[in-house]
C-alpha cells in the first residue's frame, strides 16, 4: 500500500506540472518529484546496508565504496536540479532598458547615454578570422562607441587593416599577464563608460550595445554576461556527425545553467560577450592576472566589492567553436585549471 500511495503522491504533481504553462513552476514540481524519488531510494539503500552484521574488512570496504559513489551521484544530481529549478528571463528588462536609452538619446543626444569601448583581444588569429570580427564590430548600431583591437601578436598587417577599417589599434611592449594584462593595458588608454569584450573569433550583432548598455541604469550592476553563441559545430559534434540532432556543449550551459545561476544571484562573467562598468573595473584595478580564468575571478572580486553580475540570455554575437579535438581539450583544460586556481 505504501508504494501505491507514494506513486500517486508523485504522479499527481507530475501530471499537473505538464499542464502548467509557466515553465519555472513546471520545473519546480518535476524537481520535487525527483527529490522524492531520491529520498525514497536513499532510505531503501541504507536499509540494505548490513548494519550490525559481522563482516570482514574487505566486505565493509566495498559496501562503503559503492555507497559513497551513490551518495556523490545523488548530491550532484540534487545540486544540478536545484540550480536549474528556476530560470531568469531578463528579455523584458532589456526591452524596457533599451526603450529608455533610446528615448534619452532622442531627447538629449549621445551625451545622455553611456559611451562604450569594444575591446577585441587577439594574439595569433589569422586575417580570415579577424577581418570578420573587426568589420562586424565597426558596423554596430550605437551612437557612442569605439572599437579597439588589442594585438598581443604585434603584427604590422593587422595595424594597417585597422587603419583602413577605421578602428583603433593597441599593442604593448610585452605580453605580461596574457589576456587579462592585455585588457588592463587598454583600459589605461580608453575612457568609455562601459567596456564590452569580444574574443577575436566573435562577431558582434548590430544591436548588441543597445540591448545591454541600458541595463547599467542599475548602479549596482558591474557586469552583464550574454551567451556565447556559435555558428559552427564544435569538434565533438563534427566528429560524431550529430550537429543537426544535438546542440553544442556550451548551449547546455548558457541556456540552462547560466540562467539558473542568475536566478540564484550567482551568475559569473565568462569573458567574451560580456560588458562591464568601467568604474567597477577600476575599483578592482582591472582584470585579475593571478588566474588563467580571469573572468571568473573578476566575478568573485566584484562580489566582494559589492558589484553585481547578471545574465541576459540573449545572444549579442556569434563566434567560432573549437574546430579540432586538440583545441577543444586545451580550452577545457585551461578552464579546469583556472577553476581550481579560483577555488
Please tell me what each predicted stretch does:
Residues 1-110, 162:
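N-terminal membrane-anchoring/stem segments of glycan-assembly enzymes
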Residues 83, 87, 170-194, 206-292, ...:
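Long helical/loop segments within the catalytic core of UDP-sugar-dependent glycosyltransferases
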Residues 117-125, 140, 215:
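A conserved hydrophobic helix/loop-capping motif in glycosyltransferases and polysaccharide synthases
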Residues 134-144:
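Short, acidic, metal-binding catalytic loop of nucleotide-sugar glycosyltransferases
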Residues 290, 299-318:
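Catalytic donor-sugar/metal-binding loop of nucleotide-sugar-dependent glycosyltransferases
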